[in-house]
């Protein structure tokens, strides 16, 4: 009798989990003991052939009886080896190419639009758990849901007594997902990668109840390009986040990234990149250049894509491929939309790492003199006026004690200009654009954070993307914020229900008195004021459009 009972329990534990989709299809997942995972579920038709570059089409096939126990392929990646320039040290390139990030995204394919659902063990339909939908980062050029599995977050949610379901959506990257130019705009195919994400959200709205999730309690969150994507979805259709009459999400978390400082989809630089692709693929003489690009093999298009600048090329964050205003879904420049209140009104968390710019400044190591620095700024920001450059240089002087990594004095200055360039890039794209968003956003409760957890780390400081390592693998004060507080926010719309060691204050305008910023250090959590580098803020955001790319 005891043996039979034991065998029955073992069989129960080992039984593959199931879920029933909205159309009645029943699918099987993976019992990973600490969680149950449904991996690589297609949510869109393969975006190949005539569907390349176009809006995603909802998946039409039957999934009934199929098993989803392994991640689907990553979307096509812009090869970093093709985007680096000679001034980046080869040792750095080798380290990046051998890193977990770039190894994890292989294999890849154009047929990549899948979604992953991970839930606590034993979760059934009707559990109505909050849902956290993850959008990965990677400069809109690289990345995959496979890089950072959500096991730690899901397990922590159970231990906290606030169980959540974690969903991760794949989306097209680089030229495959963010091609720009007049032809793309005329066809209505702009920002395909964002539309992939949006369709993934709609899939969640339709199907997550069958996994035990509550479609009315979805929090979207992401890091870097994923964080900027979250902001794009706040601005989508002028702030309309409804689907079938109900909100697609009720809250957003942004880790390193807010408004994308980008020109329109038919602007100068996006068109230049499009023309470069067309020319390098032999499509210049075609009567329909987009049709010609669609007729290329995957490898031919990828090779041409790899010949365009990437996020670690000389001008770095002047990205070749990124979300752009299109007059349709992103109806205007993102800074203006935020100023005008054209956003979904939901509670938000937004924050940064103290030294966001180092990773992107690394490719400017040959910028060593004052003249070099000015040339770099003018090449990076083609709309900047002489007055803009003068103000920027004054706000970010060549004094290495004022550069990034911040608060390190004369240390970490690999070149006389590197810490200066790091500071400009980090503040424009991440740290101070966060403040701009907070100063203008009135759509709901807002919380902000700044991490200085690695301030003693030589050269790097508290570098961009270190948070996702704490979030997925490590313990410490960073993990408390990126897991416990985020889980509490997704569950209760208040990070303080996580029982933090200090109360996380709501964010206010930087001009107001009082602490309004959660700060993360190696020793723990504390609060502070979001009022640093005001000269830099004024130089960068007197007219943000002067620094669009």
UniProtKB/Swiss-Prot annotation:
Annotated signal sequence range: 1-15
Q: Does the keyword Ribonucleoprotein apply?
A: no
Q: Which reaction does it catalyse?
A: a triacylglycerol + H2O = a diacylglycerol + a fatty acid + H(+)
What does the record give as the active site?
Answer: 224, 356, 464
Entry keyword Methyltransferase: no
Which residue windows are coiled coil?
none
Q: Which InterPro entries match?
A: AB_hydrolase_fold, CarbesteraseB, Carboxylesterase_B_AS, Carboxylesterase_B_CS, Type-B_Carboxylest/Lipase
Q: Which Pfam families match?
A: COesterase
- Provide the family line: Belongs to the type-B carboxylesterase/lipase family.
Q: What's this protein's name?
A: Lipase 5
Record gene name? LIP5
């Amino acid at each position: 009798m005891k043996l039979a009972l034991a065998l029955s329990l073992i069989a129960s534990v080992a039984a593959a989990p199931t879920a029933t989709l909205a159309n009645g299809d029943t699918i099987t997942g993976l019992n990973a003991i600490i969680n149950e995972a449904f991996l690589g579920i297609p949510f869109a038709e393969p975006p190949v052939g005539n569907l390349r570059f176009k809006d995603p089409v909802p998946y039409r096939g039957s999934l009934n009886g199929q098993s989803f126990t392994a991640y689907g392929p990553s979307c096509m990646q812009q090869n970093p080896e093709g985007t680096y320039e000679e001034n980046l040290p080869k040792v750095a390139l080798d380290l990046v190419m051998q890193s977990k990030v770039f190894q994890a995204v292989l294999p890849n394919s154009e047929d990549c639009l899948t979604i992953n659902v991970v839930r606590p063990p034993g979760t059934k339909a009707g559990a109505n758990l909050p849902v956290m939908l993850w959008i990965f980062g990677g400069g809109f050029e690289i990345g995959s849901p496979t890089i950072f599995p959500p096991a730690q977050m899901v397990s922590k949610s159970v231990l906290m007594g606030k169980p959540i379901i974690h969903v991760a959506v794949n989306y097209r990257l680089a030229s495959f997902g963010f091609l720009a130019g007049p032809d793309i705009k005329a066809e209505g195919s702009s920002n395909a990668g964002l539309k992939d994400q949006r369709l993934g959200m709609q899939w969640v709205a339709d199907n997550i109840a069958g996994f035990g999730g509550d479609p009315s309690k979805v929090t979207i969150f992401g890091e870097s390009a994923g964080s900027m994507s979250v902001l794009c979805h706040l601005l989508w259709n002028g702030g309309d986040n409804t689907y079938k009459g109900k909100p697609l999400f009720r809250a957003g978390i942004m880790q390193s990234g807010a408004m994308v400082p980008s020109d329109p989809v038919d602007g100068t630089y996006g068109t230049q990149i499009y023309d470069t692709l067309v020319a390098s693929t032999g499509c210049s003489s075609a009567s329909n250049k987009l049709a010609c690009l669609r007729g290329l093999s995957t490898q031919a298009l990828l090779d041409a894509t790899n010949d365009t600048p990437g996020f670690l090329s000389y001008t770095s964050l002047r990205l070749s491929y990124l979300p752009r205003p299109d007059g349709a879904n992103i109806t205007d420049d993102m800074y203006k939309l935020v100023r005008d209140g054209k956003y979904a009104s939901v509670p938000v968390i937004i924050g940064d790492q103290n030294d966001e710019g180092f990773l992107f400044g690394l490719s400017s190591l040959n910028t060593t003199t004052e003249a070099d620095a000015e040339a770099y700024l003018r090449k990076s920001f083609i709309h900047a006026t002489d007055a803009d450059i003068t103000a920027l240089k004054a706000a970010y002087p060549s004094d290495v004690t004022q550069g990034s990594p911040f608060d390190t004095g004369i240390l970490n200055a690999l070149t006389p200009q590197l810490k200066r360039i790091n500071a400009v890039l980090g503040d424009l794209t991440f740290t101070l654009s966060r403040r701009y968003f907070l100063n203008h956003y009135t759509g709901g409760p807002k919380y902000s954070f700044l991490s200085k957890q690695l301030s003693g780390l030589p050269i790097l400081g508290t570098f961009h993307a270190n948070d996702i390592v704490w979030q997925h693998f490590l313990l410490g004060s960073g993990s408390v914020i990126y897991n416990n507080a985020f889980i509490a926010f997704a569950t209760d719309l208040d990070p303080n229900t996580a029982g933090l060691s200090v109360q996380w204050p709501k964010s206010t305008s930087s001009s107001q008195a009082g602490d309004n910023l959660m700060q993360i250090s190696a020793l723990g959590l504390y609060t502070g004021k979001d009022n640093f580098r005001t000269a830099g803020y004024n130089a960068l955001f007197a007219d943000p459009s002067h620094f669009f790319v």
